[in-house]
Amino acid sequence: MSSPRRRIETDVMKLLMSDYEVTLVNDNMQEFYVRFHGPSETPYSGGIWKVHVELPSEYPWKSPSIGFVNRIFHPNIDELSGSVCLDVINQTWSPMFDMINIFEVFLPQLLRYPNASDPLNGEAAALLLREPNTYYAKVRDYIARYANKEDADITLNDSSDDDTMSSIDTESGDEIAGPMDSDF
């Protein structure tokens, strides 16, 4: 059985060698960003997000912390912080999973099958249950405003100002969710 440090290195190296765009924070394998594309055949298709991942020292026995940096409208994701509902992560997490599973299975399934009974975003949950067409329209609006390729590229590459990640926040008056690392 390998140590947690070795497992972290192995899983992050697999992710770095995959097709995902990964950026380590200060060359630290326990904190990084991944560019994530919304799964096809879902309302999130075409969306591009920057996902912040932090691996605890107890990884893989303890689940990673996952958060969307640019905004997403989803019942199980906090709209302002971008945090993914811990219950959702912890209920499905197993030490047998690796970081590739997070981006190829876990996050696509979360977006494909939102759980309105365990919401972090009450508005999204209520709309999904009561007015699904309005919910899907709002998801598409958020993708157009916060998760298109141009904005994701700016978000992924902007290192000039800690307080802004893209020009969209100053144009719309909305804040983009999550902290921005100045080295990113």
UniProtKB/Swiss-Prot annotation:
> Entry's InterPro entries?
UBQ-conjugat_E2_core, UBQ-conjugating_AS, UBQ-conjugating_enzyme/RWD
Xref: CDD domains: UBCc_UBE2H
What is the active site of this protein? C85
Tell me which EC number(s) this protein carries.
2.3.2.23
The keyword Nucleotide-binding belongs to this UniProt entry's keyword annotation: yes
Could you list this entry's UniProt keywords, alphabetically sorted. Answer: ATP-binding, Cytoplasm, Nucleotide-binding, Transferase, Ubl conjugation pathway
Q: Which residues form the signal peptide?
A: none
- What residues does the UBC core domain cover? 3-148
Q: Which GO terms describe its cellular component?
A: cytoplasm; nucleus
Please state which protein family the record places this protein in.
Answer: Belongs to the ubiquitin-conjugating enzyme family.
From the Swiss-Prot or TrEMBL record, give the protein name: Ubiquitin-conjugating enzyme E2 8
Task: Give the organism, scientific name.
Answer: Schizosaccharomyces pombe (strain 972 / ATCC 24843)
Q: What is the lineage of its organism?
A: Eukaryota, Fungi, Dikarya, Ascomycota, Taphrinomycotina
